[in-house]
């Protein structure tokens, strides 16, 4: 609806320009927002205040002329002026009801992308292999997954890329430990984290071991057959651990999506050669660097993007440049989204600028770093175990499920054990994910089990319960929505408020896809659940005064349920029919 209103305003501006009321050449960005107070309509625009000065008019006077110039539209009941010159648009209830009927009849809930579909590469998760995933890997994994799901729902072709850290010094360390303890190492490989810790301890304590580890890295990079065999083994075990967690989290990632650092090894010399051929390299203390005018340090000196060390080794920047070129040339991406820690912002700014300068990507290709903040403990400090260690992701999920089990059992002691465990799994995993997804990705946040498992506030249990209320209505009715006739009629205040929110679903998803911010979808679903609760309590559904009203409210209830379920699925959360 916002796009329709923008179009109406643009037509009014064109008419006023043609009539000489407005000067020619004005190209304002027309802003239309949802109103918070429905007594002020459904949508508001500040266009009259934006253009009052160039028009040489008072904002309210210009607002009056804009209203007079607006074309008639079946979706708008009236337009009023508010305050210093806001235009407030009131939706036509009958037209709104028709839109909701169309959404109810559509598998996509009336949501379709504006503009052509794109090929979008989503770079997400990317754990370092050879050790278990920890809580720090959660954000990239689930935020990237949520945005990828929304993009697919809107019609884009999404190519997931799990840029795992499968190359580097940690593998030399593991190889050295394997050589030193062949019998013990074979049995210890099942516990990859323990194996890694034992190898790291030797690396830190023994200079001879550390030297041997570095030499084995050189042998691995040179293609030594035995080193490569063991390297593949380490990676296979590590990736199987990752996949088990992806499956448990309900994340759409598979082995087919893995494109790790090692996949670009063969292209790294060519990346450096191509940068040299374009005259972009400068030697600095033996290292090969790219200097770009827009990047300087605090003292105003140029910052280097180092692509080759003095000893000939390559860096993350080199690999990222190779990956960017691959995504442009082979994957034919229109847009690439990198869900990587916010602390890497400067790195990606420099890599993207260098890739464009070198012609590795076409000018039309969008490169976007979707940075995120850190996940802290309840005290606001980095999330650690009691002994100061890193919290494994599997430990976090185990505790979430156990806490959810105790919560559900306390509320429903009569449920069978297997049903309790099933509900606890859904609630526990959903609570962990939603606690993260509901925060703006750029912000740090404090993880708190008590808050995230609450049935009050913007939490997964609250939304899951809202969906079960919808399911409960139809369970009590004994019929599905396909068996319900009638049409939606919006009479009560609560019906109109719920309907207006339902109609915003498509525009909301477009914003999530554009900005890479799933917290907006969480906020929308929370608001929707609250409006449904008000509707449920104030507008009798099964006990409505007549059949037409009952059927209308059942149809509104069904659309609410489908929207909640679809929204939660786009966040990667399972739903429950009863709790």
UniProtKB/Swiss-Prot annotation:
Q: State where the protein is found.
A: Cytoplasm
Q: Keyword check for Cytoplasm, yes or no.
A: yes
Primary location class: cytoplasm
Which GO terms fall under molecular function for this chain's record?
A: arginine-tRNA ligase activity; ATP binding
Q: Does the keyword Transmembrane helix apply?
A: no
Name the family the entry cites. Belongs to the class-I aminoacyl-tRNA synthetase family.
Assembly, in brief, is: Monomer.
Q: Which GO terms describe its biological process?
A: arginyl-tRNA aminoacylation
One GO cellular component this record assigns the protein to is: cytoplasm
Q: What is this protein called?
A: Arginine--tRNA ligase
């Amino acid at each position: 609806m916002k796009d329709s209103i923008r179009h109406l305003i643009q037509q009014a501006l064109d008419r006023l320009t043609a009539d000489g009321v407005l000067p020619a050449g004005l190209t304002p960005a027309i802003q239309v927002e949802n109103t918070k107070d429905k007594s002020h309509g459904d949508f508001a625009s500040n266009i009259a205040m934006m253009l009052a000065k160039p028009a040489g008019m008072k904002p309210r006077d210009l607002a009056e002329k804009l209203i007079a110039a607006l074309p008639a539209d079946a979706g708008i009941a009236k337009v009023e002026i508010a305050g210093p010159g806001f235009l407030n648009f009131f939706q036509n209830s009958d037209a709104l009801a028709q839109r909701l009927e169309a959404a109810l009849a559509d598998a996509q809930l009336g949501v379709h992308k504006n503009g052509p579909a794109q090929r979008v590469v989503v770079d997400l998760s990317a754990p370092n292999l050879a050790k278990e995933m920890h809580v720090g890997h959660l954000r990239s994994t689930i935020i990237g997954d949520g945005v990828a799901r929304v993009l697919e729902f809107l019609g884009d072709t999404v190519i997931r890329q799990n840029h795992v850290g499968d190359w580097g010094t940690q593998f030399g360390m593991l190889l050295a430990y394997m050589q030193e303890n062949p019998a013990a190492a074979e049995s210890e490989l099942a516990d990859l984290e323990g194996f890694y810790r034992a190898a790291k301890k030797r690396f830190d304590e023994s200079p001879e071991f550390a030297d041997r580890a570095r030499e084995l890295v050189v042998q691995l990079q040179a293609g030594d057959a035995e080193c490569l065999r063991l390297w593949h083994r380490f990676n296979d075990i590590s990736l199987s651990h990752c996949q088990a967690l992806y499956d448990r989290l309900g994340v759409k990632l598979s082995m087919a999506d893995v494109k790790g650092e090692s996949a670009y090894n063969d292209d790294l010399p060519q990346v450096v050669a191509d940068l040299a051929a374009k005259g972009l390299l400068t030697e600095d203390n033996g290292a090969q660097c790219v200097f770009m005018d827009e990047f300087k340090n605090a003292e105003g000196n140029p910052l280097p993007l180092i692509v080759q060390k003095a000893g000939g080794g390559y860096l993350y920047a080199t690999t990222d440049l190779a990956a960017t070129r691959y995504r442009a040339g082979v994957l034919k991406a229109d847009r690439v989204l990198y869900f990587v820690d916010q602390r890497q912002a400067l790195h990606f700014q420099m890599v993207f600028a260098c890739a464009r300068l070198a012609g590795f990507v076409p000018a039309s290709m969008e490169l976007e770093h979707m940075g995120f903040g850190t996940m802290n403990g309840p005290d606001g400090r980095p999330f650690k175990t009691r002994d100061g260690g890193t919290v494994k992701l599997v430990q976090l999920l185990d505790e979430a499920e156990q806490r959810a089990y105790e919560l559900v059992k306390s509320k429903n002691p009569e449920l069978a054990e297997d049903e309790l465990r099933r509900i606890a799994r859904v609630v526990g995993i959903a609570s962990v994910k939603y606690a993260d997804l509901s925060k703006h990705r750029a912000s740090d946040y404090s993880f708190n089990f008590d808050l995230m498992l609450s049935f009050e506030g913007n939490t997964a249990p609250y939304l899951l319960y809202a969906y079960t209320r919808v399911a409960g209505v139809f369970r009590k009715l004994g019929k599905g929505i396909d068996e319900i006739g009638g049409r939606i009629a919006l009479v009560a205040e609560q019906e109109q408020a719920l309907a207006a929110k339902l109609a915003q679903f498509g525009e909301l998803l477009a914003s999530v896809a554009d900005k890479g911010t799933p917290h907006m979808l969480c906020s929308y679903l929370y608001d929707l659940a609250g409006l449904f609760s008000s509707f449920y309590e104030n507008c009798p559904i099964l006990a409505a005064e007549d059949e037409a009203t009952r059927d209308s409210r059942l149809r509104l209830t069904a659309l609410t349920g489908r929207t909640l379920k679809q929204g939660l699925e786009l966040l990667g959360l399972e739903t429950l029919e009863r709790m």
